[in-house]
Design a protein with these regions (language model features):
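C-terminal long alpha-helix characteristic of the crotonase
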Residues: 155-161, 203, 212-260, 264, ...
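Glycine- (often His-adjacent) and acidic-residue-rich active-site loop
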Residues: 26, 80, 88-123, 140, ...
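CoA-thioester-processing core
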Residues: 121, 125, 135, 141-195, ...
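Acidic, divalent-metal-coordinating active-site segment for phosphoryl/phosphodiester hydrolysis
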Residues: 142, 198-205
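Conserved CoA-thioester-binding segment of acyl-CoA-metabolizing enzymes
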Residues: 2-87, 105, 123
Length: 280
C-alpha cells in the first residue's frame, strides 16, 4: 500500500521562481559573495549555492554569512527545490573557515555574537527541507568543514580536497557545530582525536573514515566533486520530498489505526505470544 501511495500521490506545491544570480560560466558577474542558481531541463529541481569570495578563499565573513542566510531563506520558500548543492566558484578551495582577519577587528562581544550567527547558519543548513550536498573540490577547514558537516551528504575530490577542524592549532575551538556534528558522524573517540590534533584529511582519507560519502579523482577543471554531486542530486530528484513523504506516512498510518490486526499485534506483544492476524 505504501509503495502504491508513494508512486501515485502528489501534493500541490506553490511555484515561486528563484532569483538566479550569476551561476553561469562567469560566476563573478553578479559581484556577490554568494550566488543562487536554479537548474533547468532534466536538472530542474536542483538548486545551487555558489560561494564566490576569491579574495578571502571563501572565508566566513559578515557579508558572506549574511548572504548565505539570505540565500537559504530564499530557497526554503521555493517548494520546487528538491536538492541543494553547496559548491565553490574559487578553484582549489571550498571554504577556508572563519575570516580571522575580520574577527581580529571585533570586540569580544562582537565575536560572541558573530559565532552565534555562525551556529545559526549551520542550523539553518541542517534543517533545510530538501537534501543538501557539499561538493568539496578544495580546502574545507574549520568553519568550512562545519558547513559541510551541516549538509546531508558530502562529496570530495580525492587529493585536492583537504579538510579538518583545525581550530586548536589557532588557539581556538570549533564553534559552529563541529564538536556536535563530527562525533555524530564518526563517533566520539575519533572525533576527539581529529579535533584535539587539528589533523587535516585528504578526500580519500575522509572517505575511509566515513566523513564523506564519495571521494573522486580530480579533473583538469578542478570541479570533479561538483560533477559527482550533480550526478548524486539527479539520483535523488525522483524521490518524494520529506514534507510530502511525511504526509504519505501519516495517511498510511491513519488507515492502520482502526484495524483489528493492529490491536492483535499489540495484544500479542503484551501477552508474549505470536500474533494471529486475520487481514482486517
Amino acid at each position: 500500500m505504501l509503495r502504491v501511495l508513494t508512486s501515485t500521490l502528489r501534493f500541490p506545491r506553490p511555484w515561486k521562481p528563484l532569483e538566479t544570480r550569476g551561476c553561469s560560466s562567469n560566476p563573478g558577474a553578479a559581484g556577490r559573495e554568494i550566488q543562487v542558481c536554479a537548474l533547468a531541463g532534466p536538472n530542474q529541481g536542483i538548486a545551487e549555492i555558489l560561494m564566490n569570495r576569491p579574495s578571502a578563499r571563501n572565508a566566513l565573513g559578515n557579508v558572506f554569512v549574511s548572504q548565505l542566510l539570505e540565500a537559504l531563506a530564499q530557497l526554503r520558500e521555493d517548494r520546487q527545490v528538491r536538492v541543494l548543492i553547496f559548491r565553490s566558484g574559487v578553484k582549489g578551495v571550498f571554504c577556508a573557515g572563519a575570516d580571522l582577519k575580520e574577527r581580529e577587528q571585533m570586540s569580544e562581544a562582537e565575536v560572541g555574537l558573530f559565532v552565534q550567527r555562525l551556529r545559526g547558519l549551520m542550523t539553518e543548513i541542517a534543517a533545510f527541507p530538501a537534501p543538501t550536498i557539499a561538493a568539496m573540490d578544495g580546502f574545507a577547514l574549520g568553519g568550512g568543514l562545519e558547513l559541510a558537516l551541516a549538509c546531508d551528504l558530502r562529496v570530495a575530490a580525492a587529493s585536492s580536497a583537504v579538510m579538518g577542524l583545525i581550530e586548536t592549532t589557532r588557539g581556538l575551538l570549533p564553534g559552529a557545530g563541529g564538536t556536535q556534528r563530527l562525533p555524530r558522524c564518526l563517533g566520539v573517540a575519533l572525533a576527539k582525536e581529529l579535533i584535539f590534533t587539528g589533523r587535516r584529511l585528504s578526500g580519500v582519507q575522509a572517505q575511509a573514515l566515513g566523513l564523506v560519502n564519495h571521494a573522486v579523482a580530480q579533473n583538469e577543471e578542478g570541479n570533479a566533486a561538483y560533477h559527482r554531486a550533480r550526478a548524486l542530486a539527479q539520483e535523488i530528484l525522483p524521490q518524494v520530498d520529506i514534507a510530502s513523504g511525511m504526509a504519505i506516512e501519516g495517511i498510511c498510518y491513519a488507515q492502520n489505526i482502526p484495524t483489528r490486526d493492529r490491536l492483535e499485534g499489540m495484544a500479542a506483544f503484551r501477552e508474549k505470544r505470536l500474533p494471529r492476524f486475520v487481514g482486517e
